[in-house]
């Protein structure tokens, strides 16, 4: 959950999470929070959000159980974005990409999530137009070369890979 509480309190943004994290966020003083669960989708004023499976652990900063980990499938202004979050590779990613994806955001760090090889396999299952690698280089055991990953994606798939530096953004 990282800086979620501080950001939500500072900006008044609504958080969207599984039910267990939702309850924890409310207990931390977050005022606008919406609970969901895997497989569920909901239309919001900004677009549609659907929670997908993810294969990972889920503990909150205080050590309490964070519920089932999840990814997010977003539909915003007609664009479909899949944020895999912390996960390992799973074959059902093919289903997530079936209706077309404009962007897939996938971890490449290895050790705690899928690494570059499995992330490349995920891209082949998802078939997005654009891939953005995440969850790497924040500490020693997940150091990766995102440019090498990007080159492999563009050599072996029809996807374009966009490597973002901290603080950068990507516009659809």
Question: What is each model feature region?
Answer:
Residues 10, 27-30, 44-46, 76, ...:
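Short, well-ordered coil/turn elements that cap or connect secondary structure elements
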Residues 1-26, 32, 98-105, 127-128:
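Active-site metal-binding motif and surrounding structural segment of the metallo-beta-lactamase
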Residues 36-98, 165-172:
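Core dinuclear metal-dependent hydrolase active-site scaffold
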Residues 14, 22, 26-41, 120, ...:
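Binuclear metal-ion centers of metallo-dependent hydrolases, dominated by the metallo-beta-lactamase
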Residues 7, 68-70, 92, 118-122, ...:
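A general structural detector for well-ordered alpha-helical segments in enzyme core domains, enriched
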Residues 74-129, 134-142:
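Metallo-beta-lactamase
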Residues 3, 15, 49, 86, ...:
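Divalent metal-coordination and catalytic microenvironments
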Residues 1-4, 25-27, 61, 92-94, ...:
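Short glycine-/acidic-enriched loop or helix-start segments at secondary-structure transitions
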């Amino acid at each position: 959950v990282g800086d979620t509480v501080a950001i939500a309190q500072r900006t008044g943004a609504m958080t969207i999470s599984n039910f267990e994290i939702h309850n924890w966020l409310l207990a931390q003083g977050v005022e606008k929070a919406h609970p969901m669960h895997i497989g569920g989708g909901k239309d919001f004023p900004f677009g549609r959000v659907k929670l997908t499976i993810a294969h990972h652990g889920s503990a909150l900063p205080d050590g309490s159980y964070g519920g089932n980990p999840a990814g997010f499938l977003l539909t915003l202004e007609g664009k479909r974005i899949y944020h895999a979050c912390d996960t390992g590779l799973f074959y059902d990613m093919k289903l997530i990409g079936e209706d077309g994806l404009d962007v897939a955001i996938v971890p490449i760090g290895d050790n705690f999530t899928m690494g570059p090889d499995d992330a490349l396999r995920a891209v082949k299952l998802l078939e997005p137009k654009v891939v953005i690698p995440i969850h790497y280089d924040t500490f020693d055991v997940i150091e990766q070369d995102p440019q090498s990953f990007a080159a492999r994606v563009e050599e072996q798939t029809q996807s374009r890979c966009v490597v973002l530096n901290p603080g950068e953004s990507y516009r659809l």
